[in-house]
From Swiss-Prot:
It comes from Thermosynechococcus vestitus (strain NIES-2133 / IAM M-273 / BP-1). Residues 274-309 are annotated as: Important for dimerization. Belongs to the aerobic coproporphyrinogen-III oxidase family. Its main location: cytoplasm. The gene is hemF. This is Oxygen-dependent coproporphyrinogen-III oxidase. Its EC number is 1.3.3.3. A divalent metal cation binds at residues 108, 118, 152, 182. The keyword Cytoplasm applies. Substrate binds at residues 104, 120-122.
Amino acid sequence: MTVATSASTAVPSDSRQRVATFLKDLQDQICQGLEAADGGAQFQEDTWQRPEGGGGRSRVMKNGQLLEQGGVNFSEVWGEQLPPSILAQRPEAAGYGFYATGTSMVLHPRNPYVPTVHLNYRYFEAGPVWWFGGGADLTPYYPFAEDAKHFHQVHQAACDRHHREYYPVFKRWCDEYFYLKHRGETRGVGGIFFDYQDGSDRELYRGPNPDGEAARYSQRVGSIGSRSWEDLFAFIQSCGQAFLEAYLPIVERRRHLTYGDRERQFQLYRRGRYVEFNLVYDRGTIFGLQTNGRTESILMSLPPLVRWEYGYTPEPNSREAELYSTFLKPQDWVNWPV
């Protein structure tokens, strides 16, 4: 049985159950892979209920050999009142109750040579309106081009299994989304990011910046035709299941590199950018706070230790300076020579 929608596509009657089951399985898969990589610490699970409807399970690892702190969350919430952040983007959802489910993850490694990483995949329904969103992005503290290239190549391969224009559009969208306007720099080397993918016969880019590189590229591509709910569900499954392949080889290359106080202090300083982005710009944080989500779970993305320094500038010709000059601006990482 299927339910017709305004996007001239059809949603299976068991859509919510199927997506939630996949996202919980993804949480399990990622946690098991990270526990095996850490070799000692385990995730502690905290289940919670939302009074207005729904709940979730938060899993956090602290003080591991690999992770100083990391969290992998699953949530499934519903309610009658749509948050303003959703209505601003999809006003046609007004007047309907909503359902939202997602798995989100942020890992803050101990060694400054191991990059921080973020993942989120989600699904939303409100009456006739539905869409998938998500992505994954990498935030290194020290510049290793082969790591950025590997992370992008794995996600490009996952995208290409479904459409060859997914990666070029969603890579540009990621560069645009994870950008700190007040700092004039990207959060890291990016990855993929997409939202409002509902299968309608429209351009792939559906973000807020019609003049950006993502929009311009998407306009050149034009419509790729309508896609079914099943097509898009298969796509986010491929992306989610690509994460461990994209991240763990980087971890193994960097986790045993020797570092000192200089590298640690720079890591803590750069973590400040993560805090700034998540509290000022991040759509998931804003949505969670507007829908009375669980604050501890929403703010799980923040690092355990961080510092700010007035007027910091990296030493010329240093590895830190290379991060700023090359790794905090959009690059064609898939084709980067290494």
